[in-house]
Amino acid sequence: MSPQTETKASVGFKAGVKDYKLTYYTPDYETKDTDILAAFRVTPQPGVPPEEAGAAVAAESSTGTWTTVWTDGLTSLDRYKGRCYHIEPVPGEESQFIAYVAYPLDLFEEGSVTNMFTSIVGNVFGFKALRALRLEDLRIPNAYVKTFQGPPHGIQVERDKLNKYGRPLLGCTIKPKLGLSAKNYGRAVYECLRGGLDFTKDDENVNSQPFMRWRDRFLFCAEALFKAQEETGEIKGHYLNATAGTCEEMMKRAVFARELGVPIVMHDYLTGGFTANTTLAHYCRDNGLLLHIHRAMHAVIDRQKNHGMHFRVLAKALRMSGGDHIHAGTVVGKLEGEREITLGFVDLLRDDFVEKDRSRGIYFTQDWVSLPGVLPVASGGIHVWHMPALTEIFGDDSVLQFGGGTLGHPWGNAPGAVANRVALEACVQARNEGRDLAREGNEIIREASKWSPELAAACEIWKEIKFEFQAMDTL
């Protein structure tokens, strides 16, 4: 590049940033079974070669800094440095590349998602040599997986606790999410649970506000679920949100929930933080509480295609930090979620071993060793007409959560719950009989509505409701 054609970015790059590729770009490197592997979508500044950009990511997220320092001689750089070992162009994108980086396991504290993210994504995303950077996927080696407790209980233990098998679980978020008194809130919980739902839920921003303090909510919700249990003979739960301003306050709420004898609590793991989440997950395992996880704030991190972090990484991090449920999109509802990509990270949440499959956005084969699985939660803009698709897409090991799709029923909360339970049971029965839910779904719902007036009313009110927008999260 001649001086006349050099861009300002390239001049600034040469003047202020060390040439990283000599040390950190190692295309001949053979990855180790113990390495943490990362796939970054890199958009370099004009004038910055992709190899240099990838090497800069490896350096700044491991041992490197902008210049040579004398203390480099006091350690083994070869042992501790991150390495950019492969770069490939992103199809259809002129200036984007996937940079693969390998990190030695010794760079990370055992059992700490907080430390892992502080290293890999903590500083490098503000790097001037890059226009944008997105972490697409991580491969967590067996040796590191085994340092985490993971979910407090996992899918099979949860089913055994609830004595519920062979179908998805049904839930409902209480609406309006803010403004109800604790007693009215508890009444809404009771109506939904007695109507046939397995769970009701605090919304993510229900903590302890002036209109409803947490202790009052916990008491009224516990009363509601125990009353519903007595009437239905089924084990019921309400996700009591323990998220708080301090870890001490969060734990106080979790302890009170355990003393009440309820089966499950909840945490907003991104706004609450991974340290708090892991602390709560350990308490839940030790004290027999299930842990529901809400992903509030995730779209701030994962919505943009070229910058941030893909949700599949956040999902893996949650499985390591600990949670028995996590919201994972719906594919068919009001919130973001393309089918193949969503099913990719749903498998990463549930399965013990997941093969690399770029068609579903999975960059690395992931072996979870003995870490329990997490139930994906489908929630957001779904109603009875979506039940066949949800049952077919997510299968039995899932939680299908209908907020407005329960509470918006024209006859009230309990009939709304009845409608959802009837629709689910009809879909499960039809599937077990060999019927095609994708092709015959509407017919299955219509047949069931003939003997369930609650379902018929729900079908009528939501027959025209659709959320047809193009997904942002595409391959």
From Swiss-Prot:
A GO cellular component annotated for this chain's UniProt record is: chloroplast
Q: What class of enzyme is it?
A: lyase
Protein name as annotated: Ribulose bisphosphate carboxylase large chain
State its role.
Answer: RuBisCO catalyzes two reactions: the carboxylation of D-ribulose 1,5-bisphosphate, the primary event in carbon dioxide fixation, as well as the oxidative fragmentation of the pentose substrate in the photorespiration process. Both reactions occur simultaneously and in competition at the same active site.
**UniProtKB keywords:** Acetylation, Calvin cycle, Carbon dioxide fixation, Chloroplast, Disulfide bond, Lyase, Magnesium, Metal-binding, Methylation, Monooxygenase, Oxidoreductase, Photorespiration, Photosynthesis, Plastid
Named from the GO MF annotations, one term is: magnesium ion binding
Q: Which residues carry this modification: N6,N6,N6-trimethyllysine?
A: 14
Q: Where in the cell is it found?
A: Plastid, Chloroplast
Active site residues of this protein: 175 (proton acceptor), 294 (proton acceptor)
Q: Point out the gene that encodes the protein.
A: rbcL
Its cofactor is:
Mg(2+)
Miscellaneous note, as given in the UniProt record, is:
The basic functional RuBisCO is composed of a large chain homodimer in a 'head-to-tail' conformation. In form I RuBisCO this homodimer is arranged in a barrel-like tetramer with the small subunits forming a tetrameric 'cap' on each end of the 'barrel'.
Signal peptide per UniProt: none
